Amino acid sequence: MFDDFFIRALVAGLGIAFVTGPLGCFVIWRRLSYFGDTLAHSALLGVTLAYSLEFNIALSVFIISSLIALILIQLQKRTNLPGDALLGLLAHSSLAVGLVVIGFLTFIRFDIMGLLFGDILAVTADDLLIIWIGGPLILLILKLIWKPLFASTVNYELAEAEGLNPDRAKAVFTVLMAGIIAISIKMVGLLLITGMLIIPA
């Protein structure tokens, strides 16, 4: 009745939505939508490095996005710049570097529209495997840090006083966001990932 590519697209979309829903709750509660945009923009650099080094795209995006997230956390502690200024600086810097690298990789053909908006109909069996292994793993880790993350969302000082280590929970949460971006970038695209984090929540 349905073609294989339609079934794969449906299964992939459901897998991503199941993960982005719980993550998106904290994105909304902690007002991190622009933070998600920053990680999504940095993913372009991860994609270009994956193509240039013939590396796995999802793993490359995860590494680059995680590094950007952890750098951002450290910069927020060590600088007087407003948070939104740091987000804009990192988002557009990583996006610009990614576009420059694409310009130099003339021997590789890039599907820019696919990178920006995704192509869910091009989902392969390997993509489904990554989504349905990576997704539950992200949810499992989120469950483990749910209490300190939720407590610090309500009241950071109280969570710290109770010894819940909110800074560690925040760092782990940013890495989880990098993870969902990595496994969904092919299907959703750079520009729509933040929407997938917010809308299901």
Give, region by region, the residue ranges found by the protein language model.
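Membrane-interfacial amphipathic/re-entrant helices at transmembrane-helix boundaries
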Residues: 1-18
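Transmembrane helix-bundle core of multi-pass membrane transporters
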Residues: 7-8, 79, 87-147
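Hydrophobic alpha-helical transmembrane segments
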Residues: 10-15, 58-63, 88-89, 128-133, ...
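Generic alpha-helical transmembrane segments of integral inner-membrane proteins
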Residues: 14, 18-22, 63-71, 97, ...
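Hydrophobic alpha-helical segments embedded in the membrane of multi-pass proteins
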Residues: 18, 40-42, 168-179, 191-201
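Short loop segments and helix-boundary regions at transmembrane helix junctions
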Residues: 25-108
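Transmembrane alpha-helix interface/packing and boundary motifs in multi-pass membrane proteins
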Residues: 30, 101-102, 180-188
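Membrane-helix/interface signature in polytopic inner-membrane proteins
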Residues: 140-173
